[in-house]
């Protein structure tokens, strides 16, 4: 058996081709941790119907950003950078909740290396049962079914880690540098939305998001900022305000320069590359903004990788 520790990065994943869009959506809508559609025994059937209906418009969006999600390559780049920072004694792997490499495939790869100790590190900074909770539940299911004996430590949040906050602030400064020095720029944090019912039932996601924003904005004294939520879908009540609503509100109040900061995302994927860079950018143009920009995503930011390394080292103590 190897004395090394496996670091397993948990991420949602994304389709790696246009043909993968529909099966990816089936996997997503089949997950009862994220959405409950009817009785459990019917959900896989209903998920297939929803995925079939939504596949074509979603495929068009992926076609506009290169025909696939970049999230696998970016997560693997994060894993490689993290392994280099951690040095000997660690091997990094990735597990995607709704696509490949699956949790089953990741554990098989760890097992082939003869590693028995795992630090499962969620790449969702803000805990929610719909994101980290789902990935952890899937990992526990696969572990139970495998019959393998692993010593697993879970890192399920890092919304207030100093280096994560510093990494976000660095990217915001890069975004602000794209504006004229004398321009009055406001900041709009845009986080992935969540049904309000999750928060009402005690999910800490919203409080984690708000604390991240507070800590980041301590570094930008005097700058006006807002928080909104994107990517909502379906008829249930979602977190408010929506990003579209805030864009319209700010335009109506004569805001002309806006920097959008993707929050709750640590790498580029469809929500940044299409929803923000294309859809919201077009809306901002129609609403009359003089300049609308997005701060760069964390991806392999050295500060962010240092944050992950610190989380791993502390989990391994």
UniProtKB/Swiss-Prot annotation:
Disulfide bonds: none annotated. It catalyses: heme b + 2 H(+) = protoporphyrin IX + Fe(2+). It is found in: Cytoplasm. InterPro entries: Ferrochelatase, Ferrochelatase_AS, Ferrochelatase_C, Ferrochelatase_N. GO terms for cellular component: cytoplasm. One of its GO terms (molecular function) is ferrochelatase activity. It is an enzyme of class 4 (lyase). CDD domains: Ferrochelatase_C, Ferrochelatase_N. Pathway: Porphyrin-containing compound metabolism; protoheme biosynthesis; protoheme from protoporphyrin-IX: step 1/1. The keyword Ribosomal protein does not apply. Fe cation binds at residues 192, 271. Keywords: Cytoplasm, Heme biosynthesis, Iron, Lyase, Metal-binding, Porphyrin biosynthesis. GO terms for biological process: heme biosynthetic process. Its EC number is 4.98.1.1. Belongs to the ferrochelatase family. Catalyzes the ferrous insertion into protoporphyrin IX. This is Ferrochelatase. It comes from Geobacter metallireducens (strain ATCC 53774 / DSM 7210 / GS-15).
């Amino acid at each position: 058996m190897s004395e090394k520790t496996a670091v397993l990065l948990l991420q949602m994943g994304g389709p790696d081709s246009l043909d993968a869009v529909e099966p990816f959506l089936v996997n997503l809508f089949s997950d009862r941790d994220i959405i409950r559609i009817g009785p459990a025994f019917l959900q896989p059937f209903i998920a297939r119907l929803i995925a079939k209906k939504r596949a074509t418009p979603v495929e068009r969006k992926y076609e506009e950003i290169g025909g696939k999600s970049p999230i696998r390559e970016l997560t693997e780049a994060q894993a490689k950078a993290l392994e280099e920072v951690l040095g000997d004694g660690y091997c990094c792997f990735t597990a995607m909740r709704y696509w490949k490499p699956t949790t089953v495939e990741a554990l098989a790869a760890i097992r082939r290396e003869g590693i028995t100790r795992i630090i499962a590190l969620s790449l969702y900074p803000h805990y929610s049962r719909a994101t980290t909770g789902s990935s952890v539940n899937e990992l526990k299911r696969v572990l139970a079914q495998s019959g393998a004996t692993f010593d697993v430590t879970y890192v399920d949040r890092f919304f207030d880690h100093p280096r994560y906050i510093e990494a976000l602030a660095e990217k915001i400064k890069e975004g602000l540098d794209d504006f004229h020095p004398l321009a009055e720029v406001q900041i709009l944090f845009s986080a992935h939305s969540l049904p309000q019912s999750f928060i009402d039932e005690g999910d800490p996601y919203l409080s984690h998001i708000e604390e991240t924003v507070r800590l980041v904005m301590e570094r930008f004294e005097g700058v006006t900022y807002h928080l909104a939520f994107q990517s909502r879908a379906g008829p249930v009540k979602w977190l408010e305000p929506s990003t579209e609503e805030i864009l319209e509100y700010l335009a109506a109040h004569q805001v002309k320069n806006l920097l959008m900061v993707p929050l709750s995302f640590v790498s580029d994927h469809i929500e940044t590359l299409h929803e923000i860079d294309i859809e919201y950018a077009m809306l901002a143009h129609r609403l009359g903004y003089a300049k609308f920009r997005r701060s760069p995503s964390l991806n392999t930011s050295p500060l962010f990788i240092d944050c992950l390394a610190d989380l791993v080292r502390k989990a391994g103590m």
